[in-house]
Amino acid sequence: ISPEEYWDKLSDIQYYMDEPVADPAAIALYFLSEEASKKVKVVVSGEGSDELFGGYNIYCEPLEHTSFNKIPMPIRRALGKFAEYCLPRGTKGRGFLMRHGKTLEERYFANATNIFTEREANKILKKGCEPQIQKVTKPLYERVQGKDPVTKMQYVDMHLWLVHDILMKGDKMGMANSLEVRVPF
C-alpha cells in the first residue's frame, strides 16, 4: 500500500465503518478485502482465536506478576499513585506500578485501552464526559466473579473488544468490498 493509496482511501474507509474508529487495522483489512474480493466472495478469518485461546501477551500478565501481587493492595495503590504523579513518562517500571496499583477490574477494560491514563483522559475531555468505562465492565466482571484473572480478561475481551471492534471491523471492511468474512469462533 503506497502512501497515496492510503490517503486516497482513508475517507472511504471511515465512511464504510459508519462510526469513528481509531483502529489502524481497519485500513489494512480494507485493502486485504479489496484484493481477496478479486478472486473469491467468501473468506474464513481467524478473528476471535486470540480471545478464545489466550493469544494476547496481556493474558500472561497476571501469571508473570504473582509475587508483586502478594504486596497488600493499599501499598500497591500508594506505589501506583506515586508512579503516576511523581515519575516522568517513559520511566522504566512506571506503567507496571500504575497498573498493579489497581485491581484487575479497575485496570482492565478490554484489550488495547491503555492509550491514556484516567487522569490524562480527564484533562482532555469536556466536563461530564469523564470515562465511565467501569459502568460498562462491571456487569461483565460480576458474571465471572470467582474466576481466575485470565478468564476474566478473556470474558471482557469477548464481550467488548471482539464484538465492538474486531468482528465489526472485519465485517464492515469485507462488505465494503463485497466480500463476506466468516469467523470460525
Task: Please annotate each region the language model reported.
Residues L10-Q14, V156-L162:
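Short alpha-helical scaffolding segments that buttress acidic/His motifs in well-ordered protein cores
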Residues P131-R143:
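A short, charged helix-loop
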Residues M158-K172:
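Short Ser/Thr-interspersed hydrophobic loop/turn segments at strand-loop and sheet-helix junctions
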Residues I1-I133, K169-F185:
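ATP-dependent adenylate-handling active sites, centered on carboxylate activation for C-N bond formation
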